[in-house]
Amino acid sequence: MSHKSNYRDGDSFTKQAKKAGYRSRAAYKLKEILEKELKLKRSSSVIDLGSFPGGWTQVLREFLGNKTKITAIDIQPMKKIEGCFFLQKSIIDLKDEDFEEIKEFLPFDLVLSDMAPNISGIKERDNALMINLIDSTLSVVDKFLGKKGSVLIKVFQGESLDYTRAALKKRFDKVKISKPKASRPNSNEIYIIGKELK
């Protein structure tokens, strides 16, 4: 067994996620942020960008209940979650007409993105790829997020964080940084929240 496998199996959040039936440990990141920072109503409409394998979508289903309006999008196929509309498509290639099928869900109350590029280790390249994903998320925000809506975006500390923070300050009344406990301490990831769309 590799060192990586040992670390993963020994990770408490990974064990908790498996025991609770979540598809990924990332479920606990969203749970913490929703409980502390983002208050959702049962009637909220939410889009989960980069949803595979579905951990965040599962948490949304828990928080929103049966009469849910959840849209999940990912380039990879995702096992069905009851009450969720799933579109298999690259976020970069999203078009306005892709939202026709869920027009009754619009506008969204919350846009989520847990997306990250495949890391090369080349800082400039990785940041550029991350910013491309952030721009795709911001496009959804600009077109489909309702007045006073919120956004949650995963970024890397450094250039992509600075870029996203500046972009959100132009769009939202409140901008905040979050590092959930389930995010590995040595990870460069951090989450940025925009609340109350102007």
Regions found by a protein language model. Give the residues of each.
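Class I SAM-dependent methyltransferase Rossmann-like catalytic core
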Residues: 1-42
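Helix-to-beta-strand junctions that scaffold the AdoMet/dcAdoMet cofactor pocket
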Residues: 41, 64-65, 144-147
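Conserved class I S-adenosyl-L-methionine
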Residues: 42-52
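Glycine-centered, small-residue-biased loops immediately flanking beta-strands
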Residues: 44, 68, 149
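Conserved SAM-binding loop of SAM-dependent methyltransferases across substrates and taxa
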Residues: 53-66
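S-adenosyl-L-methionine
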Residues: 75-120
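Mobile active-site "lid"/loop adjacent to the S-adenosyl-L-methionine
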Residues: 89, 106-148, 159
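Class I S-adenosyl-L-methionine
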Residues: 157-198
